[in-house]
Amino acid sequence: MGQMDAGEYDYMRACALAARGKYASAKALFEECGWGDCQARAGACVQPWPKTGVLYKNPDVKGSSAELAVQFNTEADTAMLVKVYTEGGVLARTMFIGGTGKATCSLPAGTYVIKDGVGKNWYGEEEAFGERPEGQYEIMTFDDGSQEVALERNYRSTITVNVQEDNPDAEGVGSDWESWSDF
């Protein structure tokens, strides 16, 4: 039995990453290794988009007295993953929006931090749209630049992202850059 060369070793590592659902990381390693059917395997790492809606609901974040809707206006080949965190940093919900569309989730009334990632190629919930520049990630900011937003009991809050025209009655939503690893 001969020794494994570096390309074959990286190919095996990429296979292990793909098996663990780390498709963006696997794709990058397949593209680098140059071994076997690496190009075909790299292409297979791009996953089909899930349906627009809630992907994850943390069972420990119970309640549904407030509603959050996110409207994403974009090109048909671009998608968004929205992550909603409690004030304490616990992931409460994730929502996926493919192309122009809207996703809505119910949450307990409270204060939240909302992050979003945008891209064309989907690598699953764990790695979303991959590293920059392929995926773009941010933390939404509100009012005075605060990263926190209060969702009130018995109210529906709607956030519209990538609006093509100005709406003088809408409150502005800004953003702070977020790294892929912290997303």
Q: Which stretches of residues belong to each language-model region?
A:
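A short tyrosine-centered beta-strand micro-motif
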Residues: 110-114
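Short, surface-exposed beta-strand/beta-hairpin micro-motifs centered on an aromatic residue
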Residues: 100-105
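Alpha-helical tetratricopeptide repeat
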Residues: 4-18, 40
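Primarily secretory-pathway and cell-envelope proteins
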Residues: 40-88, 92-95, 117-183
